[in-house]
Amino acid sequence: EAGVDLIIVEMMRDIENAKLVIKAALSVGLPVWIGYSAMMSENRKSVHAWYWKNKLPTSGFDELVESISTLGGDAAGIMHSQVRDTAPALEILDRYWSGPKLAYAETGELEKPDWNFKEICSPEEYATEIESWINNYGVQIVGGCCGTGPEHIRILKDRLPRYLPG
């Protein structure tokens, strides 16, 4: 039977907007997966909610996740974030979210004007990172975001079966 099976809300990075979006998604009655976007500060000492380079962050990532996680949902995690920023963000998510976790990071940088992606994380490196997210943070839902190509997914297919139940 055709139809919608779940709702995924992505780039939750602003407390006020995220609350509105998540409450609306939950009101539908379908499972809801919540994707937070995060980035490290320039000095790499703290995690911020993702923001455009020409605007300041509206909240710290810790504050965002703490405020939003109480709303519920069926899975939550980190997406549309740099690979190197994902583990620190998962560490914060782990403090406030005990449900199933997801993670899918950007593996490339956009080169304008033709929407080509320059690889910033090889397929092998990405698979290794995902394995660490599974082992260290209990991530159960994985994938790829900007720049992810067929080779990234092929290697995941080859390396992830060891994490599947019996």
Question: Model-flagged regions — what are they?
Answer:
Residues 1-166:
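Domain-level signal for soluble alpha/beta catalytic cores
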